Design a protein with these regions (language model features):
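Extended redox/cofactor-interaction regions of prokaryotic respiratory oxidoreductases
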Residues: 1-33, 58-186, 192-207, 216, ...
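Long, contiguous, secondary-structure-rich segments that constitute the structural scaffold
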Residues: 24-26, 214-272, 314-330, 334-416
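Flexible, glycine/charged-enriched surface loops at secondary-structure junctions
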Residues: 42, 72-81, 241-248
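Short glycine-rich or small-residue beta-strand-to-loop segments that form or flank ligand, phosphate
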Residues: 42-52, 62, 149
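Flexible glycine/proline-enriched surface loops and loop-helix/loop-strand junctions
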Residues: 44-46, 209-218
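Short strand-coil-strand connectors
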Residues: 137, 144, 211, 350-354
Length: 416
């Protein structure tokens, strides 16, 4: 075994921000005691952490905590509670600008050499551009062509005004999507892609379980499978991509991505199969925006999904919209009482960027000082209230004097 450092328990206190001895029993004290007594520990990381300016620093603290717990023999694990389907799979495939497939840093010489041998191409050692950097390049007139696949930055990016200006400044905007999204409406070229059930593949959920997605119908009208579209675009550049079939790509993943090694698509079965545990995500793979000062006396707007309903797919379903079809604003009972608001009131949420109107929900479990508006209702244009790099966002809330007409999801274009 490995000798346990004498200060390991003190390290736990430091990692969780425990106050000095004698400060009294509170949340951090109880957490430290539970971590010391528990046989195993799983840390669940919410998506709000990844959105915050403190994401990198907090993730580094969590990495330190997991290291101490590992020395204590706790067998710790960390799981991100992603709010997008297959986000874990996208990260595993190298979807982060500073990561290679398998969540290995781009500076890893051995990992780059392995990929270079298999792909017959040089792998850059410097991180690529994330979405923030890409949009900045657009605004600066340095983006010749921007190719967007399966996402809608005009709705998802936390600053609609900036995203609109940036996308409009690109010399050429190409969108590949199954739906005519707001972003596709700005594009010079739209490549209609297959939707769910129109092509085969796999996805990896939050717990690392990889499952099959099977094709059960052909793409409608002129739409093509995403692989076929990528092959078509490559051919326009006189390039041939290999492998180019879904089965061949899975075999390559199982060969080159450590967490997937040894898996076969036939062996996934009806319930899927777990990928192998990988080292904790290095904090350096996340962006480090400057901290945003917050005023203690201001209401702060946060956002997220309502249930498992982020709107990109689910808002296009009449059936799913019967479960959560009305946008709302959630606040604490204390804040609403101070503002003279009641449950069910139509309220205006206003920031320095814009405003929206929705029905108020008073939640007695909600902490004072926070306002929550789910992001999955496209008609609200919630991101019109947000400014890039500023999250949470300071807002004011007041009662609306008239009930506005808010588009219901049933009147939103659903694509093909």
């Amino acid at each position: 075994g490995q000798a346990l450092p004498g200060g390991a328990f003190a390290d736990i206190d430091a990692a969780i921000g425990r106050p000095a001895a004698g400060a009294g029993s509170d949340g951090p004290d109880r957490l430290a005691a539970a971590l010391q007594e528990g046989r195993s520990v799983t840390v669940l990381v919410s998506v709000d952490l990844l959105r915050s300016p403190e994401a990198r620093a907090t993730l580094q603290q969590l990495n330190n905590l997991l290291h101490v717990l590992r020395l204590l023999g706790k067998g710790p694990a960390m799981q991100f509670l992603f709010d997008r389907a297959n986000q874990m799979g996208a990260w595993d495939m190298g979807g982060l600008p500073a990561a290679l497939p398998g969540l290995r840093p781009v500076a890893d010489d051995a990992a780059r050499a392995t990929l270079a041998r298999n792909w017959g191409a040089e792998i850059p050692s410097e991180p690529g551009a994330g979405l923030d950097a890409m949009l900045e390049l657009c605004v600066g007139g340095r983006m010749g062509a921007l190719y967007i696949v399966g996402t809608d930055p005009l709705v998802a990016y936390p600053d609609r005004d900036f995203a609109t200006r940036a996308l409009g400044a690109a010399d050429l905007l190409i969108v590949q999507d199954a739906f005519l999204t707001d972003t596709a409406g700005m594009a010079e070229v739209v490549l209609p892609a297959a939707g769910y059930g129109e092509e085969s593949g796999t996805f990896t959920n939050n717990e690392g379980r990889i499952q099959n997605v099977r094709k059960f119908r052909e793409p409608v009208f002129e739409a093509r499978g995403n692989l076929a579209i990528v092959d078509f675009v490559a051919a326009l550049r006189n390039q041939a991509l290999r492998p180019s079939t879904q089965a061949e790509i899975f075999d390559e993943i199982a060969r080159l991505v450590p967490a997937y090694q040894g898996l076969t698509q036939d062996g996934l079965g009806a319930d899927g199969a777990f990928t192998k545990a990988v080292p904790t995500l290095p904090a350096g793979m996340l962006p480090a925006p400057p901290p945003v000062p917050t005023a203690a006396d201001r209401l702060m707007l946060i956002t997220g999904d309502c249930l498992f309903h982020n709107g990109y797919l689910s808002e296009r379903s009449d059936i799913l919209n019967t479960v959560a079809n009305d946008p709302y604003v959630a606040m604490s009972a204390q804040d609403t009482a101070e503002l003279g608001l009641s449950d069910g009131d139509q309220v205006i949420v206003r920031s320095g960027q814009g405003e929206l109107t929705a029905q108020l929900k008073v939640d007695r479990r909600f902490p004072k000082g926070l306002v929550f508006v789910p992001e999955n209702y496209r008609a609200l244009r919630l991101n019109s209230l947000l400014r890039r790099g500023e999250y949470p966002c300071a807002v004011e809330v007041q009662k609306a004097h008239a009930t506005p007409e808010v588009d219901r999801p049933g009147r939103i274009w659903r694509g093909v």
